[in-house]
């Protein structure tokens, strides 16, 4: 077991790649470390895979082991379970730049498993996992057109930061991950604090330039490993079948792709496909229906792309820069705290906003440390939105990814907890889909939040851009349809305000996307975004002045920190009874800030008065109306404030000499008492006699 090791300096970090010791039965395996964050990636590919498929079965699994952070998992079973949301998102992050680098005809099964085995809380493992995956695929011998590099880019005070630490990211205006080969950007994922198009494009170019050290180092590493390449070749193209299909279907496809209605268009294409298959199979028994279907799909792609490059109208009749018809409605659901129905062409999102207390915040316990999330955005894509039947259950990877993208788009305009002390949950139900449903969710979320009375810094809109490129000719498309996304060369989603970008996601399927093309796409996206924002502002010019009558209103008071235990009580008994009796939710922070959430002013006032009574200080010389709670031979104990009793000595009951306390006082009797003294131990001396004298004098 002789390891092959390659180390290189990457910005402020040292990266080490190692293979040859672990997982030697896998096709390839690499341990990648970056300043104590270590990710182990295994790749297994089936070389002699003869199974007939019409897709590439690439699976990427990313898992974080708690032992990496020196922790034992919580829960009953004390072991890692289903992937967390962050693990799912990082798996998608690895998959997206890797998938387009396998050749079109490659259908062999490939599985990538990335395992975080050691974590430095300051070094994010996602970039490390992507570098390790690139290295493992590059030494696997599979027909992988890599390697890829990866970089995280921050932006602070006009300077770009390469692979900023967790602490540096907290004050950065940008969190962008970019991945690509030596000559092409393939994937961008980012959230930003309302930055200009030029700054965002500069970040992409900066990250791609800086990651070239990774690409070159992996090439050197792969050359040292020197694993033989697979003996794989793409299936030969049946030119006679291509010609026959073009004769039978091309003109009909050109007609079908002028039908603007999605359902009618799909019906027409389905009919053409079925008829051509039937005719060709009848004329040549050696042909297979599956092969004919693949060739028909390729012809569809050619037809759509050729029309766009020639400057002909798009599938639905629009020109490249046009946006589909918009319909914006707010307050569509009577009992939700905020709601909106956003429709763009045949894409529609019903979005709701719900306000809760800080107790409703999501606690995320990851190997990077525990954190609270006070803003949740969930995206649901039911099968009916595309006119299909299907399983309805827990969210799939795509739904988790689209939800996080929409959240990134809105996050920059959300108020701070100090400005708006609520936990906010937004849910986007996609009710119709024909392209760009995640960006419809951004628009709907902005509207629903404003409808709920959340004081956003600005309205946010999102738009999906596409690209068709043939040789040196290219056309950038605004507001792409599902078919244009599927048949095009780029999916480019931008969310932002009138002032700048809040989120950018880019997936590129081809090489040769220049800075010029990205600049044109960003500028075209800005024009589209401003158009959508204008329509949104006409429907709801500004947020509601007040929150919904059905939302909890949060009232804040301050108490002495020494009194916190009095409000909470033994085992939480006092605060629990307060919540139950007043119908409120009460939260107490360590600095004595008390937040009372109630749906009515009466409930809030009741809770506030009770808390004030519980925390009130006993003042010497003040007269209180109290209740006798216990009699003793030497006097009576009187409750003057919640949880605070004082002693009326037998000599302080009245002017006459008292022989027996019970002759003058009964348990439960209300009496007026004057506070004579509070000693160092907090014991209170009371007097009924002096209270009576003072009352008489007044």
UniProtKB/Swiss-Prot annotation:
InterPro entries: ExoRNase_PH_dom1 (IPR001247), ExoRNase_PH_dom2 (IPR015847), ExoRNase_PH_dom2_sf (IPR036345), KH_dom (IPR004087), KH_dom_type_1 (IPR004088), KH_dom_type_1_sf (IPR036612), NA-bd_OB-fold (IPR012340), PNPase (IPR012162). It catalyses: RNA(n+1) + phosphate = RNA(n) + a ribonucleoside 5'-diphosphate. Its main location: cytoplasm. The keyword Magnesium applies. Pfam families: KH_1, PNPase, RNase_PH, RNase_PH_C, S1. Keywords: Cytoplasm, Magnesium, Metal-binding, Nucleotidyltransferase, RNA-binding, Transferase. GO terms for molecular function: 3'-5'-RNA exonuclease activity; magnesium ion binding; polyribonucleotide nucleotidyltransferase activity; RNA binding. It comes from the Bacteria. Belongs to the polyribonucleotide nucleotidyltransferase family. This is Polyribonucleotide nucleotidyltransferase. It comes from Psychromonas ingrahamii (strain DSM 17664 / CCUG 51855 / 37).
